[in-house]
Regions:
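Short loop/turn segments that connect beta-strands within beta-propeller blades
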Residues: 3-7, 70-74, 108-111, 156-159, ...
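Blade-terminus and WD-like Trp-Asp/Gly-His loop motifs, strongest in beta-propeller folds
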Residues: 37-48, 87-97, 129-138, 183-191
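Residue-level marker for isolated small/hydroxyl-bearing positions within beta-strands
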Residues: 50, 98, 141-142, 195
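Structural motif
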Residues: 1, 56-67, 100-105, 146-153, ...
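Conserved blade-ending motifs and adjacent loop-strand segments that build the rim/top face
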Residues: 80-85, 117-130, 159-184
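Loop/turn-rich, solvent-exposed surfaces of beta-rich toroidal or solenoidal domains
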Residues: 101-104, 120-161
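Blade-level signature of beta-propeller repeat domains, shared across WD40, Kelch, NHL, RCC1
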Residues: 179-212
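Surface-exposed loop and turn segments in beta-propeller and other repeat-based domains
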Residues: 7-31, 118-122, 163-175
């Protein structure tokens, strides 16, 4: 954890702690680990992340294990429920992610799925990138199909939704230079920012304007 104003750094979790937690959970071999998809929850009290190992051709057993930890480094918890894609926090200690082709809400205290958002016919491939609006009433999910990215904007209060046109991402569909959907809300919840390729092949930022 880094204090932006002062630059003060605090180690919340060590790789040794993660290794010990994985071994205690039954992993006989723990390869070199790295941390991915680190997310603060909305009140700043809890952090969600994945401990990963054995990826991208590196030696050792493949590991993809979610954890949570409090913002002061206490209560490191191996999460036994798994939600895929790039997770997002809902309210409190509940996270949003993909499971069994559904966009679900996962309670990190109960360690179980407690709700579902929309229907798979509306939000396809929920293992992509999702972003919740500041007021929690809207969610946007981006996903890829056939080399193209598209986004679904869904209003949770009444189920209204819209899907954007397809944006061609070829040849940047996979690999380190891939064009991920990665939507982001502005602070007042009126616009959504996403990266995408344009007709001339350059990578630009795009904005979805919500008229509500």
């Amino acid at each position: 954890r880094v204090n932006i104003a002062s630059g003060e750094k605090t180690v919340l979790v060590s790789f040794a702690q993660l290794r010990d937690a994985l071994i205690a959970d039954g992993h006989s071999e723990v390869s070199a680990l790295f941390i991915n998809h680190t997310l603060w929850n909305r009140d700043g009290g809890r952090i969600y992340f994945y401990a990963r190992g054995g990826w991208d051709g590196n030696k050792g057993a493949r590991i993809n294990q979610p954890f949570t930890v409090n913002a002061d480094g206490s209560d490191l918890t191996l999460q036994r429920g798994f939600i895929g894609g790039h997770p997002e926090w809902e309210m409190g200690h509940r996270a949003i992610g993909g499971q069994d082709d559904k966009l679900v809400i996962y309670d990190t205290d109960l360690q179980e799925v407690v709700d579902q958002i929309a229907d798979p016919t509306i939000i396809e491939k929920p293992g992509g990138d999702s972003s919740l609006s500041p007021d929690g009433n809207w969610i946007v999910t981006g996903y890829g199909k056939g080399g193209h990215n598209m986004w679904v904007v869904y209003r949770r209060t009444d189920g209204a939704w819209i899907r954007t046109p397809e944006y061609d991402q070829r040849p940047y569909v996979s690999g380190d230079l891939r064009s991920d959907p990665a939507p982001l809300w502005n602070r007042d919840g009126s616009k959504i920012l996403f990266p995408s390729l344009t007709a001339d092949g350059s990578r630009q930022l795009h904005i979805i304007h919500l008229n509500i």
